[in-house]
UniProtKB/Swiss-Prot annotation:
Keywords: Cell cycle, Cell division, Coiled coil, Meiosis. This is Protein nessun dorma. InterPro entries: Pectin_lyas_fold, Pectin_lyase_fold/virulence, SHCBP1-like. It is found in: Midbody. Its main location: other. Pfam families: SHCBP_N. Residues 188-208 form a coiled coil.
Length: 602
């Protein structure tokens, strides 16, 4: 089912927003912005009866234990204009395991009207165009803290053009890449925090209503039990205080993001920030002894090897250096460093980095590429041992709750490492090039329904040899026209081990010993050929070879399944909920603000 899409220039976006928010030359306070959009929506959107695709937000997917992104089909029963929401009735889901209430109150910006409508008399093209304007504004222009803006100041005059210009600069790579990636990360986190805040506050209000009703019933029907309830108040307090604590932490983080973004929103301050970063980098490079003259900073050199060691006993350090000696080419220059973060700040993309055992925290806003490598100073068998002590292994983790631990946009190699992804939403985002991983272990949090280990974007390829991927919602996600070669890879305790989102994704398991253990679903294949006799929309297969038989061009080999609830689940290409173009647009949209080089605004 095709959805409406719109390709517009940023000047068109600016004119559209100005047309909605023009107030005859008067001051437009932030508190009035939403009211103007409500009035515009009332004029343009059909009040009921139109079909659409609902892309379920991440916070709801997490709460309902659904994989993300999840999309469902249905129709709008009623538009709630005052809240810019709609009552959406679900009529079809992509996965039969998705269980949702039939009727849901959803935000209009989460809906994508379909081209094909049951009622041809409805003016759905105007409805779709209005939602597109609304979605662009509330996704890229309006910030969560704008509702607290002073009413005596003109919000449109101060922010509208500046923010659309910022979106344009980000999409056209006019900002220094570290700064651009940092700002995108801030924006993505702010949007997610706002969704989480809305969701938690709704839960708290519902809980308070329920508590009031219970107390009222207790006081009327059984007044003698009131003392008993008070006696257990300590236990109740511990339970109810958790959401309050979460709210406090989220509000605090939002305040930090706001203060930083309000500085970077100003073009002059952005330039000053970039110069400050550049000067700090030069000082760091000079202090590392790599260069003596500032002009040498711009000259490319041959790749070198960085050895990162944590404090330890002398004998331990000597043993690590002996191991490093066996891994470094004799003619290669070597730089000793204290932290991985410092190395990532000063190294070239083609440098080799060797890590000592221990925890290495990073907040890396650049990409890894150009045939560089990151390798742990340990034996390969130690990484994959079930009883391994992580404190004795080279572990890479995020310094805070970033959206993605590592972003790869070229050829790169990871070896003998533990990637601790328990505090990020995604372990590795592979944009293009070939990622080679040998003897690596990826750890998820084991509870999230949306966390991904490796995401392989269109045109990219990944080679995994002797790796362990465990405790993710999705171990490896293959997007269209991506490829993977897996050898002796173990998927353990994942909701979905390997995910193939379109029939053009190719996987080679030939000659390997891949295994799926204790996974809810071993392999998910979407839109693949199943033969003429297979007309069911969804099939569950016992072996990968049954799927490979009809897809010999892009699926090779076999694998083993142990204690999986379902081994291979296939969505027949004739039974897809969405057409390929629409499907891809909705799938890639969630990566638009997270470490992306080019934002495609639709």
């Amino acid at each position: 089912m095709e959805v409406f899409t719109f390709e517009k220039s940023y000047l068109e976006r600016l004119k559209e927003a100005e047309a909605v928010l023009s107030w005859e030359g008067a001051v437009m306070p932030a508190s009035q912005v939403r009211s103007e959009w409500k009035s515009y929506v009332e004029l343009k959107i059909e009040p009921a009866g139109w079909q659409a695709i609902w892309k379920i937000p991440r916070v709801i997917c997490e709460d309902l234990k659904l994989r993300y992104p999840t999309i469902v089909y249905g129709y709008v029963e009623q538009v709630i204009f005052d809240e810019l929401k709609a009552v959406f009735v679900v009529t079809a889901v992509q996965d039969s395991d998705v269980h949702l209430p039939e009727s849901n109150e959803v935000s209009l910006v989460e809906l994508w009207p379909t081209v094909q409508q049951e009622n041809a008399a409805l003016n759905v093209d105007t409805t779709a165009e209005c939602i597109d304007r609304l979605r662009f504004f509330y996704t890229h222009v309006w910030m969560p803290w704008d509702k607290d803006y002073d009413d005596d100041r003109d919000w449109v005059q101060q922010h509208l053009q500046a923010r659309i210009q910022l979106v344009c600069d980000l999409s056209k790579n006019r900002l220094p890449r570290p700064l651009a990636l940092h700002m995108r990360t801030l924006l993505a986190e702010a949007k997610y925090i706002q969704q989480r805040l809305d969701y938690l506050e709704l839960d708290l209000s519902d809980a308070e209503s329920d508590d009031e009703a219970v107390e009222l019933n207790d006081s009327v029907a059984e007044p003698a039990r009131k003392q008993s309830k008070a006696g257990s108040a300590n236990g109740c307090l511990n339970v109810s205080s958790l959401p309050v604590t979460d709210l406090m932490c989220l509000h605090l983080r939002m305040a930090i993001i706001r203060s930083e973004f309000e500085i970077l929103e100003n073009p002059e301050m952005r330039r000053a920030y970039s110069e400050l970063q550049s000067n700090s980098l030069k000082r760091l490079r000079c202090s590392s002894g790599r260069t003596r003259q500032s002009e040498d900073l711009l000259v490319e050199r041959n790749s070198i090897s960085h050895v990162v060691t944590l404090p330890g006993k002398l004998q331990q350090q000597l043993e690590l250096l002996k191991l490093a000696q066996t891994l470094v080419k004799p003619e290669s220059k070597v730089q000793l460093s204290n932290t991985l973060q410092d190395v990532l700040s000063i190294c070239q993309s083609n440098d080799d980095i060797l890590l000592s055992p221990g925890e290495h925290t990073i907040k890396f806003l650049e990409h890894l590429n150009d045939n560089g490598s990151l390798r742990g100073l340990t034996q390969p068998e130690a990484i994959l041992s079930p009883a391994a002590d992580l404190s004795l292994l080279p572990v890479v983790c995020s310094s805070d709750e970033d959206s993605t631990l590592l972003v790869i946009d070229g050829d790169y190699t990871l070896s003998e490492l533990v990637l601790d992804c328990r505090h990020v939403r995604r372990g590795i985002l592979l944009r293009n090039g070939t990622l080679t991983m040998r003897g690596c272990r990826l750890l998820g949090d084991g509870s999230s329904s949306t966390q991904e280990g490796i995401v392989c974007m269109p045109g990219a390829s990944v080679e995994l040899k002797s790796c362990l991927i465990e405790n993710f919602a999705v171990g490896v996600s293959m997007r269209p026209k991506s490829s993977a070669e897996l050898g002796s890879v173990q998927f353990k305790t994942c909701k979905t081990g390997l995910e193939l989102l379109e029939k053009s994704a190719s996987v080679n398991l030939q000659g390997s010993k891949c295994s799926f253990e204790n996974c809810a679903l071993g392999i998910l294949a979407d839109g693949f050929v199943l033969g003429e006799q297979r007309t069911e929309k969804v099939l569950v297969l016992n072996k990968f070879s049954e799927l490979q038989r009809y897809n010999e061009d892009n699926l090779l080999g076999n694998c083993s399944f142990y204690n999986c609830k379902k081994n291979v689940r296939v969505f027949n290409e004739s039974g897809q909920l969405l057409a390929q173009r629409s499907h891809q647009q909705l799938l890639e949209d969630e990566l638009g603000g997270e470490n992306k080089e080019n934002i495609q605004l639709v």
